[in-house]
Curated annotation (Swiss-Prot):
This is Cobalt-precorrin-5B C(1)-methyltransferase. InterPro entries: CbiD (IPR002748), CbiD_sf (IPR036074). It comes from Rubrobacter xylanophilus (strain DSM 9941 / JCM 11954 / NBRC 16129 / PRD-1). Keywords: Cobalamin biosynthesis, Methyltransferase, S-adenosyl-L-methionine, Transferase. PANTHER family: COBALT-PRECORRIN-5B C(1)-METHYLTRANSFERASE (PTHR35863:SF1). It catalyses: Co-precorrin-5B + S-adenosyl-L-methionine = Co-precorrin-6A + S-adenosyl-L-homocysteine. One of its GO terms (molecular function) is cobalt-precorrin-5B C1-methyltransferase activity. The gene is cbiD. Pathway: Cofactor biosynthesis; adenosylcobalamin biosynthesis; cob(II)yrinate a,c-diamide from sirohydrochlorin (anaerobic route): step 6/10.
């Protein structure tokens, strides 16, 4: 095998928070907006007056920091009040940007708070999400934020309230997320750990990858399949049709986090299905594969070319390739089928090492156009439905 490279996860550079020199705006999570709406409705219920502004405290690392929100709509009725706060996700491409987080607060005879879901908020149907099956998909931190915000608005120890959080259009939004696969049906999740949406949701995506692994483990699964996007996931599902949908995880750039979590949760076998670019970076030991944080090591691809029996001239062309795809096209044109196999073997070895040797890992490379396997680590294809 070519010379070993150190396994690493490059840090996120400052450029990830800037676009063309402009600092990107952070935004607010659905949890923060739900807490703000709940507090506005509670204050309206207690005072009998509609609210125009509301202030809430952020959790976690932002604890102590208070932020103000305008109230989009506030209505009162007999024994109830309802308020709406519109989510601003900042410069993050978030499907819930512009969502109307709505809270209806009504009196109840018993002290304390009853928190429930309304239209557009999902319900948990599978274990492994940190919430009971059958519970509203309102995560623990947002739940605490809502309760704390209510305590600031009224004394629920003397007279209790029922709070219903809803998001009009939330069910449609949820179809664009991983919620259906994770077992959250009927709408979006109310999320957030810091109360803040950071640009590009890198932290949120990493957290969702970890959560997806947890769901596989909670359902007694042993096998997980990582892909980098919709196309490679489609290829993976064709290769492994016997696995349940929950086993397939779009890992994006967070392969390292996924395999470490899988090892920690006691899973046994993992597959990585990808194209040349991501595989080339993983073969170099780079576990965080975003293009701004790492470049393809064409010298490694040249070494693999030689190892696979390619000519020195071909190796030099591969080393000068402008992308991993270009290198693969050079291999394909030369009929060097052994090179993708060696690349996948290197990836599987690196992933096993990154998991501390606790996982049986396999890697499969698919063609950019046909999505059919063009290389795999030893024994990988024998475990699939591929009979090409």
């Amino acid at each position: 095998m070519p010379e070993r490279r150190e396994l690493r996860e490059p840090p996120m550079p400052p450029s990830m928070a800037r676009v063309r020199g402009r600092k990107l705006r952070t935004g607010w999570t659905t949890g923060t907006c739900a807490a703000a709406a709940a507090k506005a409705a509670a204050r309206a219920l207690a005072s009998g007056e509609a609210q125009e502004m509301v202030e809430v405290r952020l959790p976690g690392r932002g604890e102590g920091r208070r932020v103000r929100f305008g109230v989009e709509r506030c209505e009162l009725g007999e024994g109830w009040a309802e308020a709406v706060v519109v989510k601003d996700a900042g410069d993050d491409p978030d499907v819930t940007h512009g969502a109307h987080l709505t809270a209806r607060v009504s009196w109840r005879e018993e002290p304390g708070v009853e928190l429930d879901r309304g239209e557009g908020v999902g319900v948990v149907t599978k274990p492994g999400l940190g919430l009971p099956v059958g519970a509203p998909a309102i995560n623990p931190v947002p739940r605490r934020m809502i309760l704390y915000s209510l305590e600031e608005a009224l004394d629920t120890r003397r007279r209790g309230v029922r709070v219903v959080i809803s998001v009009p259009g939330g069910e449609e939004m949820a179809r664009k997320t991983t919620n259906p696969r994770l077992g959250i049906v009927g709408g979006i999740s109310i999320l957030g750990t810091t109360g803040i949406v950071r640009p590009f949701s890198t932290a949120a995506w990493a957290a969702s990858v970890v959560q997806a692994i947890d769901v596989v483990a909670a359902q007694g699964g042993d096998t997980f399949v990582l892909s980098t996007g919709g196309l490679t996931e489609r290829a993976a599902m064709r290769l492994l049709p016997h696995l349940e949908e929950v086993c397939f995880i779009e890992v994006g750039d967070f392969t390292g986090q996924a395999v470490r979590r899988a090892a920690k949760r006691g899973l046994g076998r993992g597959f990585f299905v990808g194209m040349a670019g991501k595989l080339a970076k993983l073969a170099s030991g780079v576990m965080m594969t975003h293009w701004t944080r790492s470049r393809v090591d064409t010298s490694l691809l040249a070494e693999i070319t030689r190892k696979a029996g390619g000519s020195e001239r071909l190796a030099e062309e591969v080393e000068g390739a402008n992308s991993a795809r270009h290198a693969y096209e050079l291999w394909r044109a030369a009929g060097l089928s052994g090179a993708p196999r060696l690349l996948c073997a290197r990836v599987a070895e690196n992933l096993r090492e990154h998991a501390g040797g606790a996982l049986e890992m396999h890697a499969i490379m698919v063609d950019f156009d046909t999505l059919e396997p063009v290389g795999a680590s030893p024994g990988a294809l024998e475990l699939t439905a591929w009979r090409g």
